[in-house]
Regions:
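Residue-level detector of Asp-centered blade-edge/turn motifs that repeat once per structural unit
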Residues: 27-28, 75-76, 119-120, 159-160, ...
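Short glycine/acidic-enriched loop and turn motifs that connect beta-strands
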Residues: 38-43, 87-88, 131-132, 171, ...
C-alpha cells in the first residue's frame, strides 16, 4: 500500500459522516479524483470533489450542489465530471472550476446516478434514476438521450465516444454508436447490471451483474464469454487493449483475460 487518504479527517466541523461516492484516476496515475458525500441521507447532505496527486497532495476541492453520485476523469486530467442527486451533471476543468452543469429535465426529482467522461475528454455520459442515458459534448450540448428499461446503474464510454454502454437495474446492457443508435440491447431480466467497463477502442465491453456474473461482449454486442464469480459484481474495468478485465465481488478482486476465464 502506497498511501491512504482519510476524507473524514478533512471534513469541516459539524459533518458527522463523510463517504466516498465517486472515484477516478487519470491515464498515468498521477491524478486522482475523489467524490465525497457529507452526511448522506440527511437534510444537510452535500457533495465535494477532491483532485489529488499521487503523494497524495490535494490540488483542489470544489463543492457541488448535491451529493456526489459517481465521478470521471479524462486521461490527461483536464476534464473532471460528476453526477449528483440534485439532478445535475457537473464538468470541471483541471483547476477545479465548474465549467458547466447540465440539469436533467426533472431536476432534483431526476437524480443522476452515475457520470463518466471519455479518455480524450470529448464526451460526457451519464445515467439517471429515471431511466435516461445522456451523451454530451465538451460544451454541455446534448447529443442524444436514450430512454432505457430501468434506472441506470453504470455507464462507460470509449476514447473517442464511438461506443458507449449503459447497464440498468432491469438487467439490460445497451451498446450504442456515436449517433445514439442502439447497436444491441442484451437483456437479463433475472438480474440487475451493476457495473460496466469498456476498452479504449470500444472493441471489448464488460458487464457485472447482481447475481455474480461477468459478461464480455465485442463492439457489435455479441457475447464472447461469461463467468460466475459468486456474489454481486460491484465493479468492472477493462484495460486499454481489451486483453485484461478486472472485477470485484465481495472483498475479492478478480483478474480475467479478455478472451475469458
Amino acid at each position: 500500500m502506497t498511501w491512504t487518504f482519510d476524507g473524514a479527517a478533512d471534513a469541516p466541523e459539524g459533518v458527522s459522516q463523510r463517504s466516498v461516492t465517486g472515484l477516478a484516476i487519470d491515464f498515468d496515475g498521477n491524478r486522482i479524483l475523489a467524490g465525497f458525500t457529507d452526511d448522506p441521507g440527511t437534510g444537510t447532505e452535500a457533495g465535494i470533489l477532491y483532485l489529488m496527486d499521487n503523494r497524495p497532495f490535494t490540488l483542489w476541492t470544489t463543492s457541488i450542489g448535491g451529493p456526489v453520485n459517481g465521478a470521471g476523469l479524462s486521461d490527461d486530467a483536464s476534464r473532471a465530471v460528476a453526477g449528483s442527486a440534485d439532478g445535475n451533471i457537473y464538468s470541471l476543468n483541471m483547476d477545479g472550476v465548474v465549467r458547466w452543469k447540465f440539469e436533467t429535465p426533472g431536476g432534483a426529482s431526476q437524480p443522476v446516478n452515475v457520470a463518466a467522461v471519455s479518455p480524450d475528454g470529448s464526451r460526457t455520459v451519464a445515467g439517471t434514476q429515471t431511466s435516461q442515458f445522456i451523451l454530451l459534448t465538451p460544451e454541455a450540448t446534448k447529443i442524444w438521450t436514450l430512454d432505457t428499461d430501468g434506472p441506470v446503474n453504470d455507464v462507460a464510454v470509449s476514447t473517442s465516444g464511438n461506443r458507449s454502454a449503459v447497464g440498468t437495474a432491469a438487467g439490460s446492457v445497451y451498446l450504442l454508436n456515436d449517433q445514439g443508435v442502439v447497436i444491441k440491447q442484451i437483456s437479463h431480466p433475472e438480474t440487475s447490471i451493476l457495473a460496466m467497463g469498456i476498452n479504449a477502442s470500444g472493441s471489448k465491453l464488460a458487464a457485472g451483474t447482481a447475481d455474480g456474473r461477468v459478461f464480455a461482449f465485442n463492439s457489435s454486442g455479441i457475447m464472447a464469454w461469461e463467468v460466475f464469480l459468486g456474489g454481486s459484481v460491484t465493479s468492472v474495468a477493462v484495460n486499454s487493449a481489451g486483453n485484461r478485465i478486472i472485477a470485484s465481488s465481495g472483498n475479492t478482486v478478480y483478474l480475467l483475460t479478455g478472451d475469458g476465464p
